[in-house]
Amino acid sequence: MKKIGLFGGTFDPIHNGHFHIARAFADEIGLDAVVFLPAGGPYHKDAASASAADRLAMVELATAEDARFAVSDCDIVRESATYTFDTVQIFRRQFPSAQLWWLMGSDSLLKLHTWKKWQLLVRETNIAVAMRQGDSLHQTPRELHAWLGNALQDGSVRILSAPMHNVSSTEIRRNLSAAGVSDGIPPAAARYIRKHGLYEK
């Protein structure tokens, strides 16, 4: 059975921390592919600084060197707010026999009960969780206790051994704006940023 990983984010800009966790995601779950999903209008996130077209282009350039990585614009072409359940449904229809895995940070896991149709979502996809520094499963709200306990036991939720890399897109944008410093950004994305003058004051 084909295993497909789904990795959503604003990617504003895409940085090495994203690649660190995407590779761990692929390796630990044994994925055939990881699909990067740049957000259009994400419901649970602040607005992005770069345009959707620029963020998509940066992700496409940065992921081109790893054959396991693919990119989809399905969240961008939807003009309304995008919800994870709707995105997963797109891939479920496209790959009806595949095993889907959604990658999320532990901060998102701890708020999963606030997501649209979360109880239906977890029937459609498995979940891989990258723990953020300071987070613990002991913080899981009671609304998720029963489900998470069962899911950890049956393997439909996996906690990755690699933690979420402590890299901040906000800090990277600040460094780019203040000094043009592109540390932590894949070279192809850094070249695109310089060429198009993104994140300048």
Curated annotation (Swiss-Prot):
<keyword id="KW-0548">Nucleotidyltransferase</keyword>
<keyword id="KW-0662">Pyridine nucleotide biosynthesis</keyword>
<comment type="function">
    <text>Catalyzes the reversible adenylation of nicotinate mononucleotide (NaMN) to nicotinic acid adenine dinucleotide (NaAD).</text>
</comment>
<keyword id="KW-0547">Nucleotide-binding</keyword>
<dbReference type="InterPro" id="IPR014729">
    <property type="entry name" value="Rossmann-like_a/b/a_fold"/>
</dbReference>
<comment type="pathway">
    <text>Cofactor biosynthesis; NAD(+) biosynthesis; deamido-NAD(+) from nicotinate D-ribonucleotide: step 1/1.</text>
</comment>
<comment type="similarity">
    <text>Belongs to the NadD family.</text>
</comment>
<dbReference type="GO" id="GO:0005524">
    <property type="term" value="F:ATP binding"/>
</dbReference>
<dbReference type="GO" id="GO:0004515">
    <property type="term" value="F:nicotinate-nucleotide adenylyltransferase activity"/>
</dbReference>
<dbReference type="InterPro" id="IPR004821">
    <property type="entry name" value="Cyt_trans-like"/>
</dbReference>
<dbReference type="InterPro" id="IPR005248">
    <property type="entry name" value="NadD/NMNAT"/>
</dbReference>
<keyword id="KW-0808">Transferase</keyword>
<dbReference type="GO" id="GO:0009435">
    <property type="term" value="P:NAD biosynthetic process"/>
</dbReference>
<dbReference type="Pfam" id="PF01467">
    <property type="entry name" value="CTP_transf_like"/>
</dbReference>
<keyword id="KW-0067">ATP-binding</keyword>
<keyword id="KW-0520">NAD</keyword>
<protein>
    <recommendedName>
        <fullName>Probable nicotinate-nucleotide adenylyltransferase</fullName>
        <ecNumber>2.7.7.18</ecNumber>
    </recommendedName>
</protein>
